[in-house]
Amino acid sequence: MSSSSNRQVILVIASQAYVVYTLLSLISLGLVGDTPTFYIFGDSGVDVGNNLYINTIAKPVFPNGIDFGKPFGTPSGRYSNGRISVDFIAQELGLKNFPAPYLAPTTVGDVLLNGVNYASSGSGILNSTGNFLGRVISLENQIRYFNRTRQDIISNIGIRDAKKLLAGAIYIVATGGNDVGSSIPQRNSSSDGLASLDLRFDTILSALRSELIKLYELGARKFVVVNSPPFGCAPFVRDVLSKRDGCVSLENQMSQMYNRKLKSMLEELTKNLTGSQYVNADSYAMQEDIIQNYIQYGFQDVNNACCYVVGAHGGIVPCVTISQVCWDRTSYVFWDPFHLTETAHGIVAKHMLDGDSKYMQPMNIRKLSTT
């Protein structure tokens, strides 16, 4: 074979190798293929460990994480016995690792390309929410952290690929429950009752709207915004306001009032922000479905916290080191005074991934990931 032919063969092999290398690199960055990248914002419902790195009393100490799979006695950073909804979603869609907590020292470099979790237990939409707990990371500060992530990604892979990665990613925003819950004193002190919260909820949602637009301006396009769960069904609310089995209707009406306003706002954002899709994840409907049909889902207890200290429903004290823990965690809906068990989280995740318009409007996460 002539030297000219040898050079041609070498060039062909080199070009093919380069194409394969480039394709593999793009797949690993989430720029090619079916596995989306997730950036997650919110409160204790989706926190996976950020609060372990800050000065706050809102830390999910053991027995939180008792079934997570780490060495016994090691906190998982989650307010549950095991995995939470965002973990199930990540696994189902093929992510090799859960999106890492932003404040973990190992969340740097290529880890940022596979998704990051900025959520902080006790936080809310308003900067003042959760301040009594010590330091919490408000939604505004979570998005500031995301902006730093964005700059690091641009430095790592260049602005063109960064824009593509960020536009194709899914942004889960699961916050507002603590803002709704902290509205109870205002409602109780007003002769107008629920009507007195109209302006407060407008203020909360105006702040949320501003933060969602910031994310859009930073390159986000696919949003999943989780609404307020049925607050009146939590063991804490039952113990403090009712003492009886069954949900507290007035607290649930608060959540419903907030959720109606949120849904309208998300529809307006999708209409007015070019190329955006704001999905309303109806956490209220998902948890209501579990509570109303708990026997069909295989649960035995829908009223009490599995991890408990005191209270008719175990709802007075958070899950802490002195707590008692139920033996069969799969039979309980509620893990602690506010949060769900791993089994219940798995059902919520299934609704978010594949649920119809009763739970996800206008589409579920699986469909959003392919648009």
Regions found by a protein language model. Name each.
Residues 2-371:
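Conserved active-site regions of diverse hydrolases
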